[in-house]
Amino acid sequence: MANPFKDQSKFMKACGQTVNERNEAQYKLYCDLIDEEFNDEFKLALANNDRVEQLDALIDILVVTIGAIHSGGFDAEGAWKEVMSTNFAKIDKETGKVRKREDGKVLKPIGWVAPNLKSFVK
């Protein structure tokens, strides 16, 4: 199975970029690219109902978001596991389902604890 974090790390190294260490200029670049991909590419693809371009923009958003995570000096995989662990805690053990609002947003159950990401920030 693909590992997007490792794939992007390999690509960034080939581009001469730093990975898993804080690089403010590079971090800003990737944050700007997230904005560009979403506001320019994805929204245009939605407006045009172009599903191929929507997919391209969504994958590009993932790529530049992972680039930002690597450039921010964050532990991407550790943070991912922590966030997903807390997301899975939203699943009711008896029903195997989550509770949702009318619009589909998943609700946090009573006693839910937010992810502790402090240890993943370098």
Where are these regions (language model features)?
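Flexible "arm" and connector segments at domain edges
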Residues: 1-58, 62-122
